[in-house]
Amino acid sequence: MIPESHPRYKSLITREKLAQYTKTGIVSLEGLTAHGRGEAFDYLLGEETTESALRAEKIAAALLLSANHPVISVNGNTAALAAKEIAQLQLASKARVEVNLFHRTDERVQAISGLLKEHGITLVEGTVSRYIPLDHDRGLCHFDGMHSADVVLVPLEDGDRAQALIDLGKKVIAIDLNPLSRTSKVATVPVIDEVTRALANIARFCTELDQDEITGLTREIHGTGFIRDALEYIRERLLNVLD
């Protein structure tokens, strides 16, 4: 039992939750490693949403609201960590939600789908085909999901699938704490923030933006600027960490 007074309470509870979800197949063992890598970058960012990330989240909301067919791609870690926030974002953005896994089995898809449905999320389901040109199960998706999407939100995604979606002409919103990842580098909008904070902020902006703001935010997007901002923020924190 971790006491709430522990200075690392939220971090430890999150790790414990992920470990528990490995027992049901929702989170893969490899997913635990990926989470640890992201958490290290969250330490460097001060475990808070930067002003630059907040602007990226506002642009992400504008892209979802302006899309004809927005889709949120969900993997095991995202479902385990942020099912509540995904439900809020689906309600605010009207985006479709699709389960897509690196380590894919029918059992894992069913377990993750069940968790999401428990939170009131409506899923794109049915037959999948290899619509994304990848030699792996990550290439499998639904015709009415990512195949037809013009904007795809991919939290905690791997770089080659993000690149494949870009190559298909889709705009990609990535949520990734690592500003040096391939995913961040190729995304239309790289959101350098922790997934629950990011999704909650994007959902909030979806309820606040008016049409003029949406048009202005999506007119011209420079994703690399958010990467530079994150790296500069980390550099400044490291220079002053002992002050």
UniProtKB/Swiss-Prot annotation:
Annotated binding of ATP, by residue: R15, R37, D176, L177, N178, R182, T183
Pfam families according to UniProt: PPS_PS
EC number per UniProt: 6.3.2.36
Recorded catalytic activity of this chain's protein: (R)-4-phosphopantoate + beta-alanine + ATP = (R)-4'-phosphopantothenate + AMP + diphosphate + H(+)
Pathway(s) the chain acts in: Cofactor biosynthesis; coenzyme A biosynthesis
GO molecular function: acid-amino acid ligase activity; ATP binding
Nucleotide-binding in keyword set: yes
Keywords attached to this entry: ATP-binding, Coenzyme A biosynthesis, Ligase, Nucleotide-binding
Single biological process term from Gene Ontology: coenzyme A biosynthetic process
Keyword ATP-binding in annotation: yes
PANTHER family assigned to the protein according to its UniProt record, in alphabetical order: 4-PHOSPHOPANTOATE--BETA-ALANINE LIGASE (PTHR40695:SF1)
Subunit-structure text: Homodimer.
Chain's role: Catalyzes the condensation of (R)-4-phosphopantoate and beta-alanine to 4'-phosphopantothenate in the CoA biosynthesis pathway.
Family, similarity comment: Belongs to the archaeal phosphopantothenate synthetase family.
Record protein name field: 4-phosphopantoate--beta-alanine ligase
Source organism of this protein record: Methanospirillum hungatei JF-1 (strain ATCC 27890 / DSM 864 / NBRC 100397 / JF-1)
